[in-house]
Regions:
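Hydrophobic transmembrane alpha-helices
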Residues: 11-59, 69-70
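Structural signature of hydrophobic alpha-helical transmembrane segments
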Residues: 50-63, 109-116
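Interfacial aromatic-anchored transmembrane helix boundaries in multi-pass membrane proteins
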Residues: 72-88, 94-99
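Cytoplasmic-side transmembrane-helix entry/capping segments in multi-pass membrane proteins
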Residues: 80-91, 109-115, 137-143
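Hydrophobic alpha-helical transmembrane segments in multi-pass integral membrane proteins
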Residues: 96-109, 150-167
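Glycine-rich, aromatic-bearing surface loops/beta-hairpins
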Residues: 142-146, 155-200
Length: 200
């Protein structure tokens, strides 16, 4: 399936380049987007089946939605290979959905406080784009930062208004740990990027 996907994608790229005059930048963007969609879609199916089987499908959706929007706009650690990307995503999802909420219940006031710090960190050091993706311009960087800021801010608002309803406790814990782990990997990615630039 993967081999057939690559062949079809290469045919599409050749057609865009030869018949429609797409630039190298445009081709790089198309290739990155199509590859990302294929890889992400395959991971989502596997993760959905796994967490659904364990009875955590709703929590999975909460974590997934937050993680997808934050990763798309703010970025973070980008793995070179599918398997390492798969494993990293699994660790983040498993930790935020099952492991950490069972180990520690975080009070709503702490969720709001820590998420506010995470919101500022994401805005200040993001976005960190994949090296396989064309570098974003200043307008796109600002847009991504603002979007990431708004996503976490909306989560904070939800916690502020609905924390008294126990129905949402599980999802607030999952969302909180998802934001914290995303921010942690973003911070690690920033440090790694600085070290790469220093050694270049």
């Amino acid at each position: 399936m993967a081999a057939e996907w690559r062949i079809n994608m290469q045919s599409l790229i050749d057609e865009l380049k030869d018949e429609y005059g797409y630039s190298s930048y445009d081709i790089a963007m198309v290739k990155y987007v199509l590859t990302s969609i294929f890889y992400e879609f395959s991971k989502l199916i596997i993760f959905g089946i796994f967490f659904g089987f364990l009875g955590y499908f709703k929590s999975f959706l909460v974590s997934l939605i937050l993680l997808l929007f934050l990763r798309i706009n703010i970025g973070g650690i980008h793995c070179k290979h599918y398997i390492t990307c798969f494993l990293l995503t699994f660790v983040v999802l498993f930790s935020s959905i099952i492991l950490l909420p069972k180990l520690l219940f975080v009070a709503p006031i702490l969720i709001i406080f820590i998420c506010t710090i995470c919101m500022i960190i994401n805005y200040k050091i993001g976005p960190i784009a994949s090296p396989f993706r064309p570098s974003p311009d200043s307008i796109l960087i600002k847009k991504c930062r603002n979007t990431g800021f708004v996503i976490i801010f909306i989560f904070i608002i939800f916690v502020s208004f609905f924390h008294k309803f126990s129905l949402f406790d599980t999802y607030f814990q999952v969302g909180f740990w998802t934001i914290v782990l995303h921010t942690a990997q973003l911070f690690i990615a920033k440090i790694s990027k600085k070290e790469e630039c220093a050694n270049a």
